[in-house]
Amino acid sequence: EIVFVSAGMGGGTGTGASPIIAKIAKELNALTVAVVTIPESTEGLLRLKSVADGVTKLYNCVDAMLIVNCDMMMNVIDPNWTMERVRAYVDGVLVRSVQAVSQIVSRYAEIQLDFADLRNAMTNSGISYIGIGSGTGPNRAKDALTQALNSPLLRNQDFRGARYVLVNMTFGAKHGVTLREHDFILKSLCQYTGYNVVL
């Protein structure tokens, strides 16, 4: 029912194969979500042109596209990290992005969203954005929300007027979400996006 197409754009495999896979998924009536990385601008104009062409082709074949911009990720990555660690970090962001969406309709979720609602929110939604945050202690909800809203993945976008916001809260088994935390997060998101949004 749902297909995630994850690819690094700019090379032959991700740029060439991902639109074909996504097109097949759409033809099979699957909700099709692309989660892609685009390389740093230091990789040169020819590579970036290939990226732009690939993103455009893939965009036309999916319902929603999440873009992980490596230039923006540099704001949170230690420049002294090895390239192997940087790639592992970016891959981890891709994994968490897919998990965040898939867990919303998971049968293990405390508040489960019907798949029809997810489809309604994401079908033909175009470019989508994701913020990821975490927190511990008495201010964990506020800290996690602040991190998520300041995530480089959001790229300083203005989300007032957004139609849908999907919210996935994950807590430890012994420390479930409290009513106060739940209400704080949802009310804060309404203020951030405008009160016409569907959460």
What are these language model-derived features?
Residues 1-199:
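Tubulin/FtsZ superfamily GTPase core signature
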